[in-house]
Amino acid sequence: MENKRLTLVLFLCCHLSIFGQMIPKDTTQRFLIFINGNRGPKANHETTDNRLHEKDPTGYWYAIDDTILKRFPGVKAVYFDGHHPVNTSQHRTEFNFAKSYFFSRFCWISKRSRWVLNKRPNPEGFQLRVDHGQIAGENLLTYFAQHNIPLNQVKIDIVCHSMGYAYSLGMFDAMKSKVQFGKFLILSPENASAQGRDWNYFDEVWQYGSRADDKQSDPICYQDGIAPQVAVPGIENVPFTKGGRIYIPPTWPKRKKGFIKSHHLLYYQWFHEIKPGDRGYFQLSN
């Protein structure tokens, strides 16, 4: 009788071991990339060096990165500087920027800007940032190689702000055939209409920012004037539950909106108000 019990125990242990080996282990190594935009007038003469940083090197992100990282436990964060001079933006010159800011202060009624906000695309400036983003993407691939991280195990999520949007597209171009992509969070993209990509590469694509050029928009004086907001190309085709545009809530206090405040991350507290179940809320999933 004891021999039969022992045989049964050994049989079960053997089969459980084999069954355990048959269950595929998740070997995915996930990385969350933060890409900042222009760092302000004091840095206007500078251009990115395309280096990888393991911490926010300039304090650009305030509490935004901390909030996002809490929803991505165990994920490795890396940072790239997408800063470029104003001449690569839709403003083209600091004078144009100042003029737009001045006249926007008097637009308390009109919701559509024909000339006050600098909305004319700057394709050359945008492409320069894309090109530098490609260099950064190659640098990230080198980082993976140096740390013996198999590319078929890598999954990348991206968070970009302002000028960082163009830079992120360049990084995507450099890596799209080599790694997987998860979520793409686009915060107040600058020159957003210039280029898009095939968003099917991503699990989710969300664009956050000010609303403009429709009946539900705020008056011009409360809109994002640093990067007048339009949809990134193709986001309207992303499934409703997987992406789209998320606007500053219409109930958000006017004192917290404006040419600068509707763009700057220091005033992005409304982003933290997006709760589980709300459209645009995100967290680590597959």
Regions found by a protein language model. Give the residues of each.
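N-terminal secretory signal peptides that target proteins for export/translocation
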Residues: M1-E2
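N-terminal module-boundary/linker segments of secreted carbohydrate-active enzymes
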Residues: I23-T27, F31
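Active-site catalytic motif of lipid deacylating hydrolases and related acyltransferases
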Residues: T27, I35-Q153
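Serine-dependent carboxylesterase/thioesterase catalytic core
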Residues: R30-L32, N36-R39, N122-D224
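C-terminal catalytic-base region of ester-bond hydrolases, centering on the histidine
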Residues: V86-A98, F102-F103, W108, G125, ...
